[in-house]
């Protein structure tokens, strides 16, 4: 009986320590996103300029002029019918105007949190999620639920914390 209580005490203590370490990492992600991620404005042609675009395109994070999920992960690629640059959200072309865009590659690997090591964020957050298949999406996390703009419950392989939704904590 006493051994079980002692074991439970040390497990709780270990979990609290992991959560506090995770929160420090989450704060580093938010600070990095706020201060260090380059935000580019201008036309898509200017953004890509002399950079060769892979056939599948590249993922960009952008701030769009819309109410639901103003931050969105979109894919920049050339349309198959006229080779024009276009943005897509999943299978849908994205026609919302954007304030800025940045490449997902601008987020350092060392700040991404693995779901294996950190199963969920410590508080309600806005996340950039990687599904391990080259697909990225902005996801809201609250009340133990990961939700996309289309309200699909999802579970990524790793995530990058963009912002805390509950600023008071």
Describe these PLM feature segments.
Residues 2-169:
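Structural boundary micro-motifs
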């Amino acid at each position: 009986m006493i051994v079980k209580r002692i074991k439970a005490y040390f497990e709780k203590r270990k979990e609290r320590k992991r959560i506090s370490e995770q929160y420090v990492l989450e704060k580093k992600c938010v600070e990095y996103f706020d201060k260090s991620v380059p935000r580019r404005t201008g036309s898509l042609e200017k953004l890509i300029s002399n950079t060769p675009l892979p056939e599948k395109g590249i993922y960009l994070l952008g701030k769009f002029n819309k109410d639901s999920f103003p931050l969105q992960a979109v894919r920049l690629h050339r349309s198959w019918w006229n080779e024009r640059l276009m943005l897509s959200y999943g299978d849908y072309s994205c026609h919302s105007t954007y304030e800025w865009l940045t490449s997902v590659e601008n987020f350092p690997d060392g700040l991404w949190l693995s779901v294996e090591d950190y199963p969920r964020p410590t508080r309600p957050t806005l996340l950039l999620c990687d599904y391990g298949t080259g697909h990225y999406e902005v996801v809201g996390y609250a009340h133990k639920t990961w939700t996309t703009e289309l309200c699909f419950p999802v579970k990524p392989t790793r995530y990058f914390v963009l912002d805390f939704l509950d600023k008071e904590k």
